């Protein structure tokens, strides 16, 4: 291209030496574009790796940077829209759609470095839940994640990662299910079974609930966007009525019940009463 063509207002200038006709529509598109101007020895890491592995991203939005990492004996990447890191020799690297990406287990540990500025405790548990459910690290202490964390020497965010590791559970099917579970745990509720069967009056299958407290036959169900169409709402209402017919109580949980303090308090009180819990012993906030 000529110098004049390179200065065309129709070209997107992503970074030094990189122009494109179309603005990248995703983190993966941006990473693929940057791969043309980055050294061959780098790998995408931290929140960028999280997005490339299709792991849950921070609920309040990630910083608009590409995280890139290389070995400790190489200069840190310094480039517009990039956050450079070192230490790649201590991590596993995978290839995803021709991109070098830090492994998913190491990525979870690396996210601890971004706590609390860009990643919350709930974010760390959500990513951990996704990893153990997708890759089958279902031991009670999640040995693969624990092993990767154990190999780190005084990692930034290490205490928070250790606490998050103890809160990770096999069986959660979505980030918002994880956040709903953590909401009840923080309030002091007994731990429910995850995505568990609830039986009908004859002992047969009645429904599978997101969070199930067996003793009192109480179920909490997170209702995401797939439950918004009228047909889905009709099905959910019938499901709750059938559950009640068989002596089970089903509580619907929406995002506002998790993130809005007033809605959260009211939901926690309702479920606590259904479980015959002493409100004075709970942290309803």
Model-derived features: positions:
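Short gly/ser-rich loop at a beta-strand->alpha-helix junction or flexible surface loop bordering the NTP-binding
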Residues: 1-156, 277-285
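Surface segments flanking catalytic/ligand-binding clefts of nucleic-acid enzymes
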Residues: 132-285
């Amino acid at each position: 291209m000529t110098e004049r063509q390179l200065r065309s207002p129709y070209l997107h200038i992503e970074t030094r030496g990189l122009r494109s006709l179309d603005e990248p529509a995703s983190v993966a598109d941006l990473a693929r574009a940057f791969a043309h101007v980055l050294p061959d020895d780098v790998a995408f890491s931290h929140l960028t790796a999280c997005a490339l592995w299709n792991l849950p991203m921070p609920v309040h939005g990630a910083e608009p940077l590409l995280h890139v990492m290389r070995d400790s004996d190489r200069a840190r990447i310094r480039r517009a829209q990039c956050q450079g890191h070192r230490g790649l020799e201590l991590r596993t690297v995978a290839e995803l759609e021709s991109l070098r990406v830090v492994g998913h287990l190491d990525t979870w540990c690396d996210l601890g470095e971004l706590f609390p500025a860009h990643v919350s405790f709930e974010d760390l548990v959500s990513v951990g839940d996704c990893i153990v459910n997708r890759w089958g690290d279902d031991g009670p202490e999640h040995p693969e994640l624990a092993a990767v964390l154990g190999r780190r020497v005084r990692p930034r965010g290490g205490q928070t990662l250790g606490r998050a590791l103890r809160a990770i559970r096999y069986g959660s099917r979505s980030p918002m299910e994880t956040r709903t579970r953590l909401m009840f745990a923080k309030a002091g509720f007994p731990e429910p079974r995850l995505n568990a069967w609830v039986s009908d009056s004859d002992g047969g299958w009645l429904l599978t609930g997101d969070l199930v407290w067996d003793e009192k036959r109480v179920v909490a169900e997170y209702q995401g966007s797939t439950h918004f169409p009228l047909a889905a709402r009709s099905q959910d209402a019938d499901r709750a009525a059938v559950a009640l017919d068989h002596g089970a109580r089903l509580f619907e949980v929406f995002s506002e019940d998790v993130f809005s303090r007033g809605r959260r308090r009211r939901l926690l009180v309702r479920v606590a009463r259904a479980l015959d819990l002493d409100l004075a012993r709970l942290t309803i906030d």
